[in-house]
Amino acid sequence: MKKLFLIALFALLPFSLNAESNLDKILSSGVLKVGTTGDWDPMTMKDPATNKYKGFDIDVMNELAKDMGVKVEFVPAEWKTIVSGITSARYDISTSVTKTPKRAEVAGFTDTYYKYATVPLVLKKNLKKFPTWDSLNNSKVTIATTLGTSQEEKAKEFFPKSKLNSIEAPARDFQEVLAGRADGNITSSTEANKLVIK
């Protein structure tokens, strides 16, 4: 059972505000402030050696700023406050934000640019123990998620019998699995593909 989700390219400043005046503000300041977590490989990653961001979303934002004739400023953000950073005008725009009804009440979203599946991950040695989604929905199982992500909400929905361990960023849910503190984690197929390769 794979669950597909859609990601809007950006969450924008509160749509109740005049979009034209928001654009005017960005153009007159000459800076597009972009909120990004820097922890979702390959979309947005912060290089600890250089303190610079890289990834698909970063490339898109650099091109958008170039097309607008402004500079881009990447603002560190956390998943649990990614939308409130927009509504409080800490930054103008954010990337790779899953559109949910709750988020759409307070922020505008562009069209979807990327689709992914939400998938569980377990250690290879435990594949026989957890061959299906249902095998993870058990009161003896601990599922790790990253606090504030759409995957955290989906873990509650998919695994109501399991113990959920929501990890505060910058720590990551998969690290709990590797350390033996969780039996599995739930993440995007995008990140899962990168983790399986590693």
Map each language-model feature to its residues.
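Sec-dependent N-terminal signal peptides
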Residues: 4-16
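Hydrophobic/proline-rich hinge and linker segments of small-molecule sensing/allosteric domains
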Residues: 36-38, 109-131
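Extracytoplasmic small-molecule ligand-binding "clamshell" domains
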Residues: 21-97, 105
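Short beta-strand-to-loop elements that line the ligand-binding cleft
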Residues: 71-78, 145-146, 162-170
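Short loop->beta-strand "edge-of-pocket" segments that line small-molecule binding or catalytic clefts
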Residues: 30-36, 54, 133-148
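A ligand-binding cleft/hinge motif common to bilobed small-molecule-binding domains
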Residues: 80-84, 97-106, 153-157, 175-198
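Flexible hinge/capping segments at coil-to-helix
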Residues: 23, 124-141
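Ligand-binding cleft/hinge of the Venus flytrap
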Residues: 44-50, 61-70, 132-137, 151-167, ...
